[in-house]
Amino acid sequence: MNTMKKEEIIERLSFLGEDIRENIDKEPYLSMYIKAQQENAWFLKENIQYSLKQFLPWLEKKELHDFVAKYEENKKQKNLAIVCAGNIPAVGFHDILCGLLSNCSLQVKLSSNDKVIIPFLINRMSEKTELPVRFVDKING
């Protein structure tokens, strides 16, 4: 996968924040809530929306810039495997956010109880630029 510049990642993440803010009660989010609940009966629309709203402070450009300024930049893209739990809607999203901001190519193993929300969010961010995120059934490496 291509190495993305940090600014591109920040743009995509802040776009997602705006998208959530503007569309949380509209399509295609409404369809995603239905699919997620079909997969996990505990993932009610209200619970998913609550989780999404908790991400909003992380998805502000200023917050993202402040966050990355605290760390030395990885010049060379590294591979990172993330195994997501499934007890809270999109619980692995913060790990993905940190991996992207750290210039990592991600292998993400989703929980069997949450295979809808995170791919949906990555898809929303990837509309203009492909992100270095690959969903896998088994972590290799």
What are these regions (language model features)?
Residues 1-79:
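N-terminal Rossmann-like NAD(P)+-binding subdomain of aldehyde/semialdehyde dehydrogenases
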Residues 33, 64, 70-141:
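Rossmann-like NAD(P) dinucleotide-binding subdomain of oxidoreductase/dehydrogenase enzymes
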